[in-house]
């Protein structure tokens, strides 16, 4: 593969085929392409607009080069991040609830643009985010939950870290996280930072051997199920791609004030989650339940979203014990107790 020819093709706004994109991504991730060319390629892709084939090719390369573990029937709640609203880390809270009934392989990283990525909030709760593969399998067996820290499970990505940091713009790698779970999770609730990317990412997901993925983008521009209004969804399954629009009131609840969901730090996010689990923060609890409801539908545990919401009400009642179990087997209970004390007021 001639990298300069690939670059010329991208500059001319021609899309790469899947195989071309996969080969290119492998060369970049392995550190075989000079940084100046890597930056040129990433910018050219962004300016052209990443195609479905390019996303699929890059995702396949990242999956192949990842440290892998096997977690049958797992669900992930990883989204793209990057909506910039700074809301409580609801995907992590939902993952904890889901682990009461199904294996969860939560793929994630530190915050991109928000105040609290999955890794940040789990650390604040006392969780040890560096989990080697054998230990990960053991934790799933014992607790139904494991966090797969992206930087640990995709070690070759260090070869592009400097370029990405120097560029300081969104690149194709920012949207690959939820498509590259190291446990090859077959089910997913995937928040998407932009409504415009729903179609592109759903078509990409369809090519990547998922059983069922629900991609969501909610009003007012949030990469979660909307707490205030409409959520735009793409439901991807073996049968194809279905487009759905759903309003928060369709759960049978009122809209949730967005300002009640904003956090200032990872610790703040952890406290809000624990308060919701304890029944002390109704707004955050509702936000967790509506997102969990859609994830339950992705797992085919319920027949519709409203039934999922009713199921989530039951799950959140058992969430504190589950969180204690998860941290006690892989973390620092002292940290969790500190958060519990701060949450009890």
Curated annotation (Swiss-Prot):
The keyword Isomerase does not apply. It comes from the Archaea. Coiled coil: none annotated. 5-phospho-alpha-D-ribose 1-diphosphate binds at residues 79, 82-83, 87, 89-92, 106-114, 118. Binds 2 magnesium ions per monomer. Mg(2+) 2 binds at residues 223-224. It is an enzyme of class 2 (transferase). GO terms for cellular component: cytosol. Mg(2+) 1 binds at residues 91, 224. GO terms for biological process: L-tryptophan biosynthetic process. It catalyses: N-(5-phospho-beta-D-ribosyl)anthranilate + diphosphate = 5-phospho-alpha-D-ribose 1-diphosphate + anthranilate. Anthranilate 2 binds at residue 164. It holds the Pfam family Glycos_trans_3N. GO terms for molecular function: anthranilate phosphoribosyltransferase activity; magnesium ion binding. Its EC number is 2.4.2.18. The keyword Manganese does not apply. Pathway: Amino-acid biosynthesis; L-tryptophan biosynthesis; L-tryptophan from chorismate: step 2/5. Belongs to the anthranilate phosphoribosyltransferase family. HAMAP family: TrpD. Catalyzes the transfer of the phosphoribosyl group of 5-phosphorylribose-1-pyrophosphate (PRPP) to anthranilate to yield N-(5'-phosphoribosyl)-anthranilate (PRA). Homodimer. This is Anthranilate phosphoribosyltransferase.
């Amino acid at each position: 593969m001639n990298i300069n020819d690939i670059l010329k093709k991208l500059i001319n706004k021609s899309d790469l085929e899947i195989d071309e994109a996969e080969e290119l991504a492998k060369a970049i991730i392995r550190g075989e392409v000079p940084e100046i060319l890597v930056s040129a390629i990433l910018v050219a892709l962004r300016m052209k607009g990443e195609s479905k084939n390019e996303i699929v090719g890059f995702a396949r390369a990242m999956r192949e080069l990842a440290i892998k573990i096997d977690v049958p029937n797992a669900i992930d709640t990883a989204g793209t991040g990057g909506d910039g609203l700074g809301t409580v880390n609801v995907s992590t809270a939902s993952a904890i609830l889901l682990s009461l009934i199904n294996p969860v392989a939560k793929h994630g990283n530190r915050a991109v643009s928000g105040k609290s990525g999955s890794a940040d909030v789990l650390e604040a709760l006392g969780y040890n985010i560096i989990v080697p593969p054998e230990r990960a399998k053991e934790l799933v067996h014992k607790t139904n939950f494991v966090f797969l820290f992206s930087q640990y499970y995709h070690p070759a990505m260090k070869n592009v870290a400097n370029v990405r940091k120097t560029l300081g713009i969104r690149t194709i790698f920012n949207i690959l996280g939820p498509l590259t779970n190291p446990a090859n999770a077959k089910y997913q609730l995937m928040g998407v930072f932009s409504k415009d990317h729903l179609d592109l990412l759903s078509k990409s997901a369809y090519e990547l051997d998922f059983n069922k993925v629900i991609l969501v983008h909610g009003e007012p521009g949030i990469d979660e199920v909307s707490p205030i209004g409409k959520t735009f969804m793409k439901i991807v399954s073996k049968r194809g791609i279905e487009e759905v629009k759903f309003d928060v009131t369709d759960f049978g609840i009122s809209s949730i004030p967005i300002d009640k969901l904003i956090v200032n730090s990872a610790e703040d996010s952890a406290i809000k989650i624990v308060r919701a689990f304890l029944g002390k923060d109704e707004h955050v609890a509702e936000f967790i339940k509506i997102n969990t409801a859609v994830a339950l539908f992705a797992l085919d545990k319920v027949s519709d979203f409203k039934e999922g919401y009713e199921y989530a009400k039951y799950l959140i009642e058992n969430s504190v014990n589950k969180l204690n179990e998860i941290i006690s087997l892989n973390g620092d209970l002292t940290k969790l107790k500190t958060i519990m004390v701060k949450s009890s007021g």
